[in-house]
């Protein structure tokens, strides 16, 4: 990843959904090797903010600007957004799912083994997604982060359904990503123990 100059700037951002103001006046900046943890009650706008950053939700007001990345690609094309729901095709095997992501999203020419090993899924490679447990499905969704390297990770409750060992594995991957100059914005109710991570609490329509 060539991320040494990567910088994300959010200015006076607002979000409205279904005629309801979710948040407004939100501003922050984030640089390479930095993580921002979003907290706040349900409905405060954590998921909406992540979707705005990923380009999946319209910006009601304000600006989102990425500098230092690939000028030919949008923020969404330089980021992985992993939502709180796992969008997986039940009939595909674990390895087929990863190979699909590599083909569809583009990746360096290597096998899927690295991603499988990173998330502890190698022994399940040929198993159909339909037979996976909730925790295994979550790990498969997160394997996309490794299978197709991108500098920005946008994670919505990434630890949902994960046991303690899997959470530790994920945190190690997140620390490794930051160590290589990556950027992470994550909404979570769990203290991930990311040294130096900044906190942004959403609530009552504004960032506090």
What do these predicted ranges mean?
Residues 54:
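Helix-to-loop junction immediately C-terminal to a conserved catalytic motif
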Residues 59-77:
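Conserved ABC transporter NBD signature motif
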Residues 85, 90-106:
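Q-loop/switch helix immediately C-terminal to the Walker
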Residues 99, 110-125:
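Conserved ABC ATPase "signature" region
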Residues 128-135:
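Conserved ABC ATPase signature
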Residues 142, 181:
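Hydrophobic anchor residue at the start of the ABC signature
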Residues 153-157:
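Catalytic Walker B motif of ABC-type/P-loop ATPase nucleotide-binding domains
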């Amino acid at each position: 990843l060539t991320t040494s100059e990567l910088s994300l700037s959010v200015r006076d951002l607002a979000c409205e959904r279904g005629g309801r103001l979710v948040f407004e006046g939100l501003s922050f900046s984030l640089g390479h090797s930095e993580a921002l943890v979003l907290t706040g009650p349900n409905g405060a706008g954590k998921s909406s903010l992540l979707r705005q950053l990923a380009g999946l939700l319209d910006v009601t007001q304000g600006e989102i600007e990425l500098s230092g990345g690939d000028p030919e690609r949008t923020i969404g094309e330089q980021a992985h957004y992993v939502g709180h729901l796992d969008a997986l095709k039940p009939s595909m095997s674990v390895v087929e799912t990863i190979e699909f992501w590599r083909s569809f999203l583009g990746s360096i020419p290597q096998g899927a083994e690295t991603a499988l090993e990173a998330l502890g899924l190698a022994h399940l490679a040929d198993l159909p997604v339909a037979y996976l447990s909730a925790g295994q499905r979550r790990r498969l969704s997160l394997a996309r982060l490794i299978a197709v390297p991108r500098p920005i990770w946008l994670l919505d409750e990434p630890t949902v359904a994960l046991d303690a060992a899997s959470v530790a594995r994920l945190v190690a991957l997140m620390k490794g990503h930051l160590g290589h100059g990556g950027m992470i914005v994550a909404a979570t109710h769990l203290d991930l123990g990311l040294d130096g991570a900044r906190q942004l609490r959403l609530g009552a329509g504004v960032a506090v």
